[in-house]
Amino acid sequence: MRPSNFIFKEGRLFLENISVEKIAQEIPTPFYLYSEASLEASCKAYTSNMDSSDLVCYSVKANNNLNILKTFVSQGLGFDVVSGGELQKVIKAGADPKKIVFSGVGKTTSELKLASDLEIYSINVESAFELKNIINLETKPRISFRINPDMEGDTHPYIETGKADCKFGMSEKDA
């Protein structure tokens, strides 16, 4: 579906009544072009029927453009980060630490400390080793466990995330 802020007039593409051709003459190509109004409208459409206590988190690995992150902050979204760099970037964008979830394997001790010091919403624990590192922190962060259900999915083997030998999550027994 094409967002309504992108329209064709006389065979030319416009974004919010600005000629994309004119933009391409002013900045080097190729480039990415986003509509802030479309992003805001999408956020509102997605969250409009949710309870105010629901936390919608944008996955920063999808696109970590600072201006896009700032737009999502302005819309009240939270963030799912998978590295210390992403965590620092959403903080720079103005994110509320209480709306940040830190997921992903291989979190370093310094990344865990930063997340704990910022008092983020939650750190998703992916392994017993990671849990030991969290226990050794001076501050005690809020945590959740990513449980690997040991289930096969109808998908390509390279992108399966629920089998016992998957690097993501931990067994229910280990948790």
Labelled PLM ranges:
Residues 118, 127-175:
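Conserved anion-binding
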Residues 1-123, 128-141:
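A charged N-terminal "starter" segment
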